[in-house]
From Swiss-Prot:
Residues 50-67 are annotated as: Intervening spacer sequence 2. Interacts with SRF, forming the SRF-MRTFA nuclear complex which binds the 5'-CArG-3' consensus motif (CArG box) on DNA via SRF. Interacts (via RPEL repeats) with globular actin (G-actin), thereby regulating its subcellular location and activity of the complex formed with SRF. Either forms a trivalent (by binding three G-actin monomers) or pentavalent (by binding five G-actin monomers) complex with G-actin. Forms a nuclear ternary complex with SCAI and SRF, leading to suppress MRTFA-induced SRF transcriptional activity. Ubiquitously expressed, has been detected in lung, placenta, small intestine, liver, kidney, spleen, thymus, colon, muscle, heart and brain. Expressed in peripheral blood mononuclear cells (at protein level). The lineage of its organism: Eukaryota, Metazoa, Chordata, Craniata, Vertebrata. A motif (Bipartite Nuclear localization signal) lies at residues 27-65. This is Myocardin-related transcription factor A. RPEL repeats lie at residues 24-49, 68-93.
Amino acid sequence: MPPLKSPAAFHEQRRSLERARTEDYLKRKIRSRPERSELVRMHILEETSAEPSLQAKQLKLKRARLADDLNEKIAQRPGPMELVEKNILPVESSLKEAIIVGQVNYPKVADSSSFDEDSSDALSPEQPASHESQGSVPSPLEARVSEPLLSATSASPTQVVSQLPMGRDSREMLFLAEQPPLPPPPLLPPSLTNGTTIPTAKSTPTLIKQSQPKSASEKSQRSKKAKELKPKVKKLKYHQYIPPDQKQDRGAPPMDSSYAKILQQQQLFLQLQILNQQQQQHHNYQAILPAPPKSAGEALGSSGTPPVRSLSTTNSSSSSGAPGPCGLARQNSTSLTGKPGALPANLDDMKVAELKQELKLRSLPVSGTKTELIERLRAYQDQISPVPGAPKAPAATSILHKAGEVVVAFPAARLSTGPALVAAGLAPAEVVVATVASSGVVKFGSTGSTPPVSPTPSERSLLSTGDENSTPGDTFGEMVTSPLTQLTLQASPLQILVKEEGPRAGSCCLSPGGRAELEGRDKDQMLQEKDKQIEALTRMLRQKQQLVERLKLQLEQEKRAQQPAPAPAPLGTPVKQENSFSSCQLSQQPLGPAHPFNPSLAAPATNHIDPCAVAPGPPSVVVKQEALQPEPEPVPAPQLLLGPQGPSLIKGVAPPTLITDSTGTHLVLTVTNKNADSPGLSSGSPQQPSSQPGSPAPAPSAQMDLEHPLQPLFGTPTSLLKKEPPGYEEAMSQQPKQQENGSSSQQMDDLFDILIQSGEISADFKEPPSLPGKEKPSPKTVCGSPLAAQPSPSAELPQAAPPPPGSPSLPGRLEDFLESSTGLPLLTSGHDGPEPLSLIDDLHSQMLSSTAILDHPPSPMDTSELHFVPEPSSTMGLDLADGHLDSMDWLELSSGGPVLSLAPLSTTAPSLFSTDFLDGHDLQLHWDSCL
């Protein structure tokens, strides 16, 4: 609609344009329509060479023939009695009974019509079925001769009135039915008073059955006659056309005869109705009649059920006949006994009128929608007489009614961390059904086909709190005793069944067998068990918290008692034993006093480390996640956490746990929550290095130590590197003392000599041999992906706490730099595709634009002018990305073979950097040894 301000002329113009467009379109259509011959070929037009006048006559003839056929059918239409018999005309049940049973003989119009053949064939097959289902009766005569009371019992009293007189009348005079009805009424009161002693419903089938033989024979006679007469109706041929008026004259006699029959039937029908009404008024039976018979008749007409239905609505409650084939015929209570009968199993199939009648009989409110009526009846059924044979299918929502039964289903990524984790890469089918058995042990059944992969590195590490029995292959094994897990699952008392779900996400329901089990138990016992579980869990939680506090105090004491000279660490085994502790800081952050720890952020649990966390077999990746808690700094430092994990979530801080990636890579996640501002980053506990003394990693399972520090991301790329880093001695003075392993490695000394000779570091740097584990020749970083050629991270990244000595730390710290400078994880363990790319782009632009780092001697990637400040406070204390060292020197300097045999961490890794970012000779590493 154009704006109102536009003038009327504009609208006019628009309308005319639209009209013109429509006109053009129609003209085009007319022009492009196919030829007549084409239309004839496609049977759209008829091929006729006749003149138009002939065609017009042909049409007239067709119409006349149609009209003729219709007139014939109207003339021979069935009378009202036949309509009642065929369940087309709704009438009161008593009338219908009399007519259907055949006690009233009436002239059948349909005998001479072809119409009846079709209609009776269509309608009659239902009757035999219904009769047979109602039980067999010896002979039709038996019912006719049967005692009036017997025939009356199953029907309502009014039926007796109409049936018995008709039975006597029909043999004498059809049209004098007024007189005889008067004697029988006295029979009715006894039948009413003795309502309780009424026999079974067998009499109902008796009445119905009696008409079956007759109707079958009539049908056969009728169909024979109709077949004989059919040619008469269709005998008019095209050239013998006779106009309708002449035809009527000629066909008047038969039409009159059929019309006379219809009139006869009409009279008889009216008389029956009048009789019926008189009887009703005379005996005042309206009060005990069932729901209006008309609705029953309509229901029958619409649903096509056999006439049995209308009878069975009025059956007594004691009647035990089987329901009719459609499931609609039911034995209800009647006016005779007044007791409500058993409801059928399928209430949904009942009509609203029937439901209301049932409710009336049970003196329940009748108003409301069909569903409400059904609910009311169901409730009544459950209270009074639950039918054991017909259990109702419970609604899906009402399965878990019982207090003790709970099945918790959540995506695998969200276990125990609540909203703290971003469930990034999970398919909806990867639902973990976590169930707590009565022993308090949490069991997990994953419904995904592969073990769910954690979208963020912290996800699993928060869960595992050192269950020594769990094997590394069992991805959820470490969680079994996690207090966090149990707390999240046990907000309410639980008595839970372990059930492996199918791939339907979130539809967790208890198996019926289990439900029966639970119901059988004593409820008091269950409650006691639950109380015990809760107490045990709270006790465990308190113990963990005390442990956290103790370790926190220990760390603070050690931090105060630190001396500048750290202990040297041996490099004897092919697995690097990294005992050095990272004391480096973001160069931007001034050395402040050590901040007291948030108890929930301390990382004590590293001494629970699972001895089998380093699994032999597929290559593992140690992903350490550090939650650094930035304090307010002069430069704006928005805290960008990897997931929305608050510090309070990391209470039971976890040992490195094993997660199997979708590519088969094991990711060992350790959480070392760090305080970004305590210069020593001392929350990486000193016990950590010795926590895995006895597990040397086998050669194939080289692990990559990707530390993901959750670092503040600073406002501008260059602001990161503006400040000069603190001196080496200062940094060292704040470094916690590491456990000394005694044998200072000769290889490390050689490395320092080489570096000093090449002019890469100053001579006074020879002092700290304690940082061997941190040497990170970047060319070998991430399993041969082009990432690997990055220079080792320079001093401005805070190196996180070293991994346990059992895990051979890769000499690649590029990721630390990437994360510390951007605050984002470089490689997430799962399916994160494009995210790392943007991170690397940011980093690339930062490194290219920052001028503070360009005063360093050229590194192997001189082409991209990436130089790093040789900061003495860096964890390595030496910048190993030396231009004079060839890539092969790095291979020799590294701590042996296993480091190179890494499998790719993620499928997106090779695409992280463009290859022009690297210098030529850096790319000549042994990529194939990595793959």
